[in-house]
């Protein structure tokens, strides 16, 4: 069984502090015993001194388990099919307090599209955010547990995501997988939103950007939004062959 634990991070003072803390608890409560390789992915901003700073924060007996890998320069390039101006106009509306930047959205895409090539050659991989903390000792090897139970994916939490942030997701999947509508129906919660409220004005503007005038959704006072139930994937373990199907 070939395994690895992956981080994706940036070389800023705040993120380095988070990463050091995460690594401390990773080894204290799990990996000093089970000794899985730890791979820190970055966009080329971790020079020798920065890498050394991180390595010296890890207990000496475990430093050899930690390595750094620079991402391909094109990994975070905006795809050609995306209209940059339209995207920037949508982001500028800030429809919710946690409306995300273009870089954050590219990061989400990276985990789905590009991460598998860095996980190639491993049977199972774990993802941790650089601010993830394993708070208590784990008295069993998570990878062995994962393999024993013949799992494809495991996370520590399910949550209901924002219906505004995920607008159009349910319809997209139903159009792409018409024979899975019943299953998809169980994966989303309906929300009725009052479209006359002044707080919904940014979302109304978003709809006008996303849809041609003759394709605008019809609503009198409210609109149904669909919130997906999804894994909180700041922590997960997965079988790499699942993503190669």
What residues fall within each predicted segment?
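N-proximal low-complexity "stem/linker" segments adjacent to membrane-targeting elements
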Residues: 1-24
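Short loop->beta transition adjacent to catalytic acidic/histidine clusters or analogous donor-positioning motifs
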Residues: 3, 31-39, 63-66
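Short, charged/polar "capping" segments at the starts of alpha-helices
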Residues: 15, 44-52
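Short, acidic, metal-binding catalytic loop of nucleotide-sugar glycosyltransferases
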Residues: 24-35, 57
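Short beta-strand/loop segment that forms part of the nucleotide-sugar
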Residues: 36-44, 69-75
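Active-site-proximal specificity loops/subdomain of glycosyltransferases
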Residues: 57-121
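Conserved catalytic core of nucleotide-sugar-dependent glycosyltransferases
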Residues: 90-104, 108, 116, 132-245
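Short beta-strand-to-loop acidic/aromatic patch adjacent to the donor-nucleotide binding site
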Residues: 120-135
């Amino acid at each position: 069984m070939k395994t690895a634990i992956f981080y994706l991070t940036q070389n800023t003072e705040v993120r380095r502090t988070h990463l050091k803390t995460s690594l401390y608890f990773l080894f204290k409560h799990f990996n000093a015993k089970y000794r899985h390789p730890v791979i820190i992915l970055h966009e080329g901003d971790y020079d020798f001194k920065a890498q050394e700073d991180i390595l010296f924060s890890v207990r000496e007996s475990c430093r050899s388990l930690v390595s750094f890998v620079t991402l391909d320069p094109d990994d975070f390039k905006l795809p050609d099919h995306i209209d940059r101006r339209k995207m920037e106009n949508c982001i500028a509306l800030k429809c919710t307090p946690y409306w995300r930047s273009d870089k954050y959205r590219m990061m989400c895409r990276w985990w789905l599209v590009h991460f598998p090539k860095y996980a190639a050659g491993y049977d199972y991989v774990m993802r941790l955010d650089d601010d993830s903390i394993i708070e208590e000792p784990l008295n069993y090897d998570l990878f062995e547990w994962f393999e024993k139970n013949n799992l494809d994916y495991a996370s520590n939490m399910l949550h209901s995501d924002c219906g505004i942030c995920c607008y159009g997701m349910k319809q997209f999947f139903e159009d792409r997988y018409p024979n899975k509508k019943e299953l998809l129906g169980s994966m989303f919660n309906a929300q009725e939103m009052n479209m006359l409220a002044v707080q919904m004005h940014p979302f109304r503007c978003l709809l006008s950007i996303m849809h041609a005038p003759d394709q605008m959704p019809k609503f009198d006072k409210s609109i149904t939004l669909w919130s997906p139930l999804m894994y909180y994937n700041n922590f997960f373990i997965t079988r790499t062959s699942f993503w190669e199907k």
